[in-house]
């Protein structure tokens, strides 16, 4: 049967739309240097936007194509997932079920790594942001159901799917579930487990009041053009023929933020809005060789961050859990030796800049940081003992000065296991 005229016209329009979109995704080669494309960075894009250069596009494509293992608990097999694959599967599934995806972005340290890999920060988690409308509880639930259902597609051949339920998949592969629903923030996060800490984090965002702490972690890279190119173009990418990819700095000025990343500068806007975790990020940057820019009021910045840390994490159990998770996520493997330096830096900042606590509360937190630092030092082996910052030469081995903490150093067992735990329900996020 021949198609009707209306059907033919409909197909032609659809083909024209795809062709137009694919053509729009293709651009002339950017300069081979490490900076943004000067043409794409014109004033028409706005100061907060910039086109990526060809080397940056290549790094982005390689990052999205690199298989990442999603480790299963118990007898569940390890899944091998390319980030671009899971983005495409999740996006198409959401839209098939009526939830429109307005765009997909790479966020955080992975985006910073694509723009400037020599910063020394590296990246752990792969943060993929889906812009969606989350106006109802059903929308939140749909994002979770779609991600869990998509995991079935990545199970190895030969694995029986008959008795595998979404609840089973959640227990097997999900590291963390977070749901935030307030007047200013509506988003959810699903983190997929990776034993090395390189979790794939799928974040579904309707609105977020603030998505960055400092200029160097404010970057987002729009992935739509690159994903469309890989689907539509039979020609491989080259310097002369590749998609035009746009980056954005939520800090405001893209060129300024990129300059901060290159020269290891700590800068921010509205420091009073930084969340509690910003204090840990700040100490992390200091340990990596970043320094506040000369115009920064360092004392005020540190006081803001300390105050917010104790607002968001008011008791010792929460503080310990937060510190251990952060250290495990950012200082594992070859970087484990930096844990001690980060904790010493955190101790100094909290000691100098905490003004919102009673003296005994402040002392409890400092003692907690000290205990974690001693534990980190012990894990480095006996040779590291000479680096103990709080030890006086005349103090006998194993004794910590009374001016800091009044107890002997003994083997410390972590209160919370470092193994990746599962979270069966949404976690509240302040």
From Swiss-Prot:
Main location: cytoplasm
EC number: 2.7.7.19
Composition bias, Low complexity: 15-44
Keyword Signal set for record: no
Region (Disordered): 1-46
Catalytic activity reported: RNA(n) + ATP = RNA(n)-3'-adenine ribonucleotide + diphosphate
Compartments (UniProt record): Cytoplasm; Nucleus
Any one GO MF annotation of this record: poly(A) RNA polymerase activity
Classification via InterPro entries: TET5 (IPR012937)
TM helices/strands, residue ranges: none
GO biological process, one term: negative regulation of cell population proliferation
Domain of life from the UniProt record: Eukaryota
Record's keyword terms, sorted: Cytoplasm, Nucleotidyltransferase, Nucleus, Transferase
GO cellular component: cytoplasm; nucleus
Recorded family membership: Belongs to the TENT family.
Entries under PANTHER family matching the protein: PRION-LIKE- Q/N-RICH -DOMAIN-BEARING PROTEIN PROTEIN 44, TERMINAL NUCLEOTIDYLTRANSFERASE 5B
Protein purpose: Catalyzes the transfer of one adenosine molecule from an ATP to an mRNA poly(A) tail bearing a 3'-OH terminal group in an ATP hydrolysis-dependent manner. May be involved in maintaining the translation efficiency of at least some genes through preventing degradation of their mRNAs. Prefers RNA molecules that are adenosine-rich close to 3'-end. In addition, may inhibit cell proliferation and cell cycle progression through ubiquitination of beta-catenin/CTNNB1.
Protein name as annotated: Terminal nucleotidyltransferase 5B
